[in-house]
Amino acid sequence: VDRLGDELIAGGYIQRFSIFSFFILPLFYSKYSVKYSSFFVPILFIIFLVGIILSGNRMPLLLFIFTLFLMLIFQKQLRKYLLSTILMLSIVFFSIYNINENVKKNFLSFYSQVNSIVEIALKDNNFKEKPQYLKEFSTFYDTWLMHKYIGGGIKNFRYYCHERPNIKKDVKFVCNMHPHNYYLEILTETGLFGFLILVVAFVNILYTIFYNKYFIKHNLNENIMIIPFIFLFIVEIFPIKSTGSFFTTGNTTYLFLILGILIGLIQRDISIEKKI
């Protein structure tokens, strides 16, 4: 599970699709769900966790943990497993961390990068030894200012980044194809108008789902099928993370597939409730 080709992306696939496996028994084998879930779910959790850690992907590991904790917090029947999940997570992570030298170096590097970002944010914004991702994020602002309201056009960040004002020609750092964050990319390429349209749509969908699922009496309260899609959608649109390109990779296909299924499940339950 180390890498696919030259890219450290295997962990991202595990993070995005592993959550569904936890719901296979309740959905398709409800008769055996209670009997076997306590055995299979921990095994699956350990397999996926080990796979993500060994893949070398740091962000997918954080997102995988974030997804699990969201489900444990919002699903009442799962809250009793919170402490055991934390314990299992800690044992697996630190065991691999101490045994595998590559994993140790990988996460020490990640820790160092996070510290550098915090130090730059709090003390010196011009710190010369910026982590690579922070340099990529910082190219966004001047590029966005060139076309604040309507953007520079889809897939044009790679062009305008080199034409932005205040660019330092003597610096070796070269602009990337995108700023490695969905929201920054959408801002630079579609402007404030495109950004607001997309954000309003996401917030509206998220509010509708959560309100119907967790805060009022609704058919969705008992809908197990919708649970993984809700939390995968939340994690996918979570703003504080590094991402691939929104417009040029399979990320958007995955996001809108999740979105379409969510809307379909909501509309189905609303239709059933109205008929009743």
Task: Annotate each language-model stretch with its function.
Residues 2-8, 53-63, 177-181, 240-254:
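Membrane-interface catalytic loops of GT-C/OST-like multi-pass glycosylation enzymes that act
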Residues 5-77, 84-88, 98, 204-211, ...:
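Alpha-helical transmembrane segments of multi-pass inner-membrane proteins
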Residues 6, 53, 138-141, 147-150, ...:
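A conserved mid-to-late transmembrane alpha helix and its immediate loop/hinge
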Residues 23, 65-69, 226-276:
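Transmembrane alpha-helices of multi-pass inner-membrane enzymes
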Residues 28-39, 79-83, 215-224, 266-276:
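Transmembrane signal-anchor hairpin modules in multi-pass inner-membrane enzymes, especially those
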Residues 69, 73, 78, 82, ...:
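Hydrophobic transmembrane alpha-helices and their immediate junctions
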Residues 75-123, 138-146, 154:
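A membrane-periplasm/extracellular boundary helix in multi-pass inner-membrane enzymes
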Residues 112-162, 175-185:
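Membrane-interface loop/short-helix elements at transmembrane-helix boundaries
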